[in-house]
A protein has these predicted regions:
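Walker A (P-loop) phosphate-binding motif
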Residues: 32-98
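A transmembrane-helix-recognition feature enriched in membrane-embedded lipid enzymes
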Residues: 7-48
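Alpha-helix C-terminal capping segments
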Residues: 6, 73-74, 116
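Phosphate/Mg2+-binding loops and adjacent switch elements
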Residues: 86-115, 119-186
């Protein structure tokens, strides 16, 4: 019964928020146009940067995809994973070490570091600065994997991998706040 009430309440709230979709769309559209016209800077790097992201809120398997890429690449390349570190209690650039906790770097980067102790895992809200600091501190770094990077346009990855959940197709959804999409489909 509780699930039904919650579902109905969420449907009602999304209908109430529907007029705000236009405002959200305009903000996202303008921001993207500023990047597209080079009025806001997007930096590319002279080594491979692979971004993994999605258009919708919620879990689509970004961290498992990062882990899959780590498994593929770590035998051949010196790699680093850079995440925002969602939910962490620290600020700025933090590189994981033996004594770093999930409170300092966030749950998902901590999970990645525990599974792959030989790779570099770092967190920074500013992806551009994070990549620069990773390269400065690790001159032999060859590949950077960006976790949840699709909306962070200050960095232009050489390859972007966009994930979706097979149950929640983009074509069946609308923008926030009435829907789950962070970006317009196009």
């Amino acid at each position: 019964k509780y699930k039904i009430i919650t579902f109905v309440l969420m449907k009602l709230l999304r209908k109430i928020f529907l007029p705000l979709n236009l405002v959200y769309f305009l903000v996202v559209f303008l921001r993207n146009k500023l990047f597209d016209c080079n009025l806001l800077e997007s930096m590319s790097f002279d080594f491979p940067v692979i971004g993994v992201g999605n258009l919708s809120i919620g879990g689509t398997g970004k961290t498992p995809m990062i882990e899959y890429l780590v498994r593929i690449l770590m035998a051949e390349y010196k790699i680093a994973v850079l995440s925002r570190g969602y939910g962490r209690k620290s600020n700025g650039f933090v590189m994981s070490g033996d004594s770093v906790s999930s409170e300092i770097i966030g749950d998902e980067p901590y999970q990645i570091k525990n599974k792959f102790p030989d790779i570099i895992v770092a967190v920074n809200n500013d992806r551009k600065a994070g990549i620069e600091l990773l390269k400065k501190n690790n001159s032999n770094l060859e590949v950077v994997l960006l976790d949840d990077s699709f909306q962070h346009r200050k960095v232009n990855p050489g390859l972007s991998i966009l994930l979706t959940c097979y149950r929640d197709l983009y074509c069946d959804d609308i923008l926030l706040p009435a829907g789950n999409l962070r970006e317009p489909i196009n």
